């Protein structure tokens, strides 16, 4: 209870300082709107239909890109974690591609797919791929070798059976940590994917900023924060259910 009260107090102080800065003229309100300006801007966006349209588009990009990126990342991470030959084969490919930031792929996404939904999905998928890949690879590699030897002694000689019975359950906590990190990273990638003209929250933020409608920009920033909070809460619940055997 004490921690909750402190958290609420900290939030109230933050909001109060935020409101005071533009009201006292320390910063032009057109550059930094106070919290009191956000609800009217939100209601205006909802009434115009722009908010719902943007949220729907971004959720479509987010879910598709996240699914593609995490699916490939988990699959390849598990394979390279299980087999030394696969890790060796991909070692230099990983070293070359890993340092390239997701934003660097934007020009290629536009060239290959145009300013379109596939381009946004590609950028988001690239943005989360490496996080999940290394999480899965590291989690599989960290599995106790004694467990693998015991599995082989009990007849689990095929890679698929070892994966199903030993490796995946043991590596699940590490993989899920990577997936949770990817949830937040994907929202960052959504903005990068949409600021170049693809319909969604990022595009709407850029349109608003070009008109100095900073209150609208904040509306969409908070919308992303709220959506991430919902996804993260749902994922933590799912994670607890999947790992209930550890309790």
Each model region followed by its residue ranges:
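Transmembrane alpha-helical segments of polytopic membrane transport and secretion proteins
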Residues: 1-12, 233-247
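Cytoplasmic-entry segments and transmembrane alpha-helices of multi-pass inner-membrane transporters
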Residues: 75-111, 134-143, 149
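Short cytoplasmic-facing helical segments at TM-TM junctions of multi-pass membrane proteins
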Residues: 135, 139-175
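Transmembrane alpha-helices
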Residues: 122, 126, 159-192, 219, ...
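Hydrophobic alpha-helical transmembrane segments of multipass integral membrane proteins
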Residues: 5, 9, 13-17, 52, ...
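Loop-to-helix entry region at the N-terminal start of transmembrane alpha-helices
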Residues: 53-61, 111-131, 171, 176, ...
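Glycine-rich helix-loop "coupling/hinge" segments at transmembrane-helix boundaries
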Residues: 110-112, 140, 188-224, 243, ...
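Periplasmic/extracellular loop-to-transmembrane helix junction in inner-membrane transport proteins
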Residues: 23-70, 207
